[in-house]
Amino acid sequence: MITIHNLNKRFAEKILFENFNLSISDGEFVVFCGESGCGKTTLLNMIGCLEKPDSGSIIIDGVDIWKTKRKRDLFSYKLGFLFQNFALLEDKTVLQNLKIINKKYRSSMSPEEALEQVGLLDTKDTKVYKLSGGEQQRVALARLMLKQSDVILADEPTGSLDDRNADVVMELLHKINKSGKTVILVTHNDRIISNESRVIKL
């Protein structure tokens, strides 16, 4: 459960959030949408411990994330991130990228199993820089599966992809969500928003 209470955030003279409140239940698929500059990514970053609010609280499973001394543990294990730029080690193979995560988090799933889940097992020995953008984002999704975070924060993950690859990524995100994970997605692309999603217009 994520509870946001009386959240305030401003940049210079621009108020992005004023006494903003929101509750997100475990296992929801939530979409933040709205015009450019409305605060979608800022809100996601505040939930993800990447950007501090001016005041107010963000509570995840009973822990106020901006007051706890266990922020690093929360960041490392509870939250998983999916960005537009993939954040992979391009000079390493697909399998090497996943083994780094598997070793760190001691996942119950093997890297090969994660690759099979995203349909990329045959690329395991390929250097990441040789993959298409859509394939790289699927590797990033396989990495999330290995991390097994309860909350997935996805910031414009289809922003640089064509429609076909965007649809594949969204299908995989919904698959992760249906396994019991909470997914919070930021997008400006109405086309990828599913009827199954809870849409928050900012």
Where are these regions (language model features)?
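Hydrophobic anchor residue at the start of the ABC signature
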Residues: 141
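Conserved structural motif at the start of ABC-family nucleotide-binding domains
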Residues: 2, 17-19
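Catalytic Walker B motif of ABC-type/P-loop ATPase nucleotide-binding domains
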Residues: 152-155
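Conserved ABC ATPase "signature" region
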Residues: 108-123
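Helix-to-loop junction immediately C-terminal to a conserved catalytic motif
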Residues: 48
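ABC ATPase NBD Q-loop/coupling interface
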Residues: 57-73
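Conserved ABC ATPase signature
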Residues: 127-131, 135-137
